[in-house]
Amino acid sequence: MAFKIYTKTGDKGETGLFGGKRLPKYHLRIEAYGTVDELNAYLGLVRDSLGDEATRDVLKEIQDRLFTIGANLASDPDKSMSTPDLLDSDIEALEQQMDLMDTHLPPLKNFILPGGHPSVSYCHIARTVCRRAERQVVALAANEPVEEILLRYLNRLSDYLFVLSRKMAQDLGVEEVSWFARK
């Protein structure tokens, strides 16, 4: 029998975690992994807008890691379950990519306004969704067990997406627009 997308079990506003526990769809855990899923969709949009195969490969790996985070958040914390691992080396890979991109970028002297090209804007949207996901996971961690590495990865990922947006703008020949406070 083929797997069906629709189950009808969520028609009354609840959804199930891996492990069977049912939660209302407004629960912070559901919001957190739903936002990670939203981030993953935006990263697909960014990846699809790039011609650089190496960066596309990095983004695909990041999307895989976001599924790992989603699986972890979608699992019942009260049950001992085997979920895919997120590793320190995953965070180190983001840091290495940022360091590499930074060697090609001018020093940052001011805040910059998002935009300049649709693909750069998509990357900034992904960055802000990542920050929202991070805030939701932090809020969840204040009430329930959450692996600390998930928070570190999301924090580092938003930094990576900021640097990537700058590198994309540079590669596209788009001038960064600095923000200056009105006086």
Task: List PLM regions with ranges.
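Phosphate/pyrophosphate-binding loop motifs in nucleotide- or prenyl diphosphate-using proteins
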Residues: M1-K183
